C-alpha cells in the first residue's frame, strides 16, 4: 500500500455527484497494490495520525494533524502502482482489483477516523477533479508491505 501525504492549506475533490473539501490538513493519494492488506492500512493510518508535519514557532516539524485541528481529504489513486518498465503506456496490473481495493480503501479511512480525525473522501473508481493548495510544500510517501512500513 502506498499513500502520498501532502500538507495543504486547502484541498477539494469534485465530480458530477461529489463536492468534498477541507481547509488546513492533509490530502492523501491512496494506492492499493496487489498485496495490500488491512494490516498495511493500519500501520500507515497510525503513522499519518501521529506524523509531526506542522511547524512550531522555531520552524521545526513538531505538531501532528490533531494538534493543528486539521482535516484529511483521502483520494483513491490506483495509478500509484503503475508499471512503466516497458513501452510508453503504463500498466496497472500491480494494483489490486477494484472489488477488493475499495474494501481496503474504506477500511483505511475508517482506521484514520478511529484516531479522531475528520476524513472526507473522493469517490472510489470514478474520474474526479482534485484541487490541492500545497503548504510548504511538505510531501511524504508512506509505503507498507506485510504490515510493515518500508
UniProtKB/Swiss-Prot annotation:
Keyword field: Cytoplasm, Hydrolase, RNA-binding, tRNA-binding
Matching entries from Pfam families are given as: Tyr_Deacylase (PF02580)
Q: What is this protein's name?
A: D-aminoacyl-tRNA deacylase
Instruction: Tell me where it mainly resides.
Output: cytoplasm
Q: What is known of its domains?
A: A Gly-cisPro motif from one monomer fits into the active site of the other monomer to allow specific chiral rejection of L-amino acids.
Source domain of life: Bacteria
Q: How does it associate, per the subunit comment?
A: Homodimer.
Gene Ontology BP annotations: D-amino acid catabolic process; tRNA metabolic process
Which of the seven top EC classes does this enzyme belong to?
hydrolase
Which EC number(s) does UniProt give?
A: 3.1.1.96
Amino acid at each position: 500500500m502506498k499513500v502520498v501525504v501532502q500538507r495543504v492549506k486547502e484541498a477539494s475533490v469534485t465530480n458530477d455527484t461529489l463536492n468534498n473539501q477541507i481547509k488546513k490538513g492533509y490530502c492523501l493519494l491512496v494506492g492499493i497494490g496487489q498485496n495490500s492488506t488491512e494490516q498495511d492500512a493500519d500501520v500507515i493510518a497510525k503513522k499519518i495520525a501521529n506524523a509531526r508535519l506542522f511547524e512550531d514557532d522555531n520552524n521545526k516539524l513538531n505538531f501532528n494533524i490533531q494538534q493543528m485541528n486539521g482535516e484529511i481529504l483521502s483520494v483513491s489513486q490506483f495509478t500509484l502502482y503503475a508499471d512503466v518498465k516497458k513501452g510508453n503506456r503504463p500498466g496497472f496490473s500491480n494494483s489490486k482489483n477494484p472489488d477488493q481495493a475499495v474494501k481496503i480503501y474504506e477500511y483505511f479511512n475508517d482506521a484514520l477516523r478511529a484516531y479522531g480525525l475528520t476524513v472526507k473522501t473522493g469517490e472510489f473508481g470514478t474520474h474526479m477533479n482534485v484541487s490541492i493548495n500545497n503548504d510548504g510544500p511538505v510531501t511524504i510517501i508512506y509505503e507498507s508491505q506485510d504490515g510493515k512500513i518500508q
